[in-house]
């Protein structure tokens, strides 16, 4: 029982941290546009957000993989 309560409290603290900081955690990615685009999906405290990046295998022009964390445009507390 103690383990369940601690797990729920940890999840609540992480959610509050995401809500106040405005960051999202990567939950999925896929290539699109004939392999030139990369679509990354992030879980934020307010839902999910999708971002499009230019994608190359070499990383010469843009990114090769989605970043693990991403700052959202909408933040609850800018203080």
Curated annotation (Swiss-Prot):
Keyword Signal: yes
InterPro entries: YobH (IPR025611)
Domain of life, source organism: Bacteria
Entry keyword set: Signal
Signal sequence residues: 1-33
The protein, known as: Uncharacterized protein YobH
Originating species: Shigella flexneri
């Amino acid at each position: 029982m103690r383990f369940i309560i601690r797990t729920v409290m940890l999840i609540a603290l992480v959610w509050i941290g995401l809500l106040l900081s405005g960051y999202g955690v990567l939950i999925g990615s896929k290539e699109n546009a004939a392999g030139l685009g990369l679509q990354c999906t992030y879980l934020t405290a307010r839902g999910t957000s999708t971002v499009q990046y230019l994608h190359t295998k070499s990383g010469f022009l843009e990114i090769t993989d989605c970043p693990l964390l991403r700052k959202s445009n909408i933040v609850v507390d800018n203080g």
